[in-house]
Amino acid sequence: SYSGAQVIHPKTIRPLENKRIPLLVKPFGDPTAEGSRIAEDGVGPINVPVYIWRKNQILITMRAKDFAFALESSLSEIFEIIHHHRLKVSLIQSSAVTISVCVDNTRFVPEAIAELQKHFNVTYNENLSLLTIRGTTPEILEKAKAGKTIMLSQTTRRTARLVVVEQA
């Protein structure tokens, strides 16, 4: 790319990967530099953390109005509404009585929330960001959390996802 792209989309890489064609990426600021080669050559995982920020997120939490039934029976209804209103879900977390989804804050969100409120008790938080850290460690995670208001956190062996209040 001669336009200085900072991200190579997976849809660009996937066809090359499928045909085992290596991709050479040169730095925009110095095209004569060595660059990086993306290829299938048996190299192990990179031990460098990768930080991915998704800004302008909303965390929507739904709770069943009638506690006589478990929320699991309502999952299809929730996701049908989310799909109908074209919301892009970035993260999902569920419990016995609630389900929370982190979605992009688009013009479709208010109508989706209004429809969800017809069926569920709904709370939501705006002005959030989703931070995903791939290749994390406990030390990296603690540094990432420092000074932030965490609304929701998910951690697996090597990946952490934090929904945080955006800082002005």
Where are these regions (language model features)?
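C-terminal catalytic "cap/lid" subdomain
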Residues: 1-168
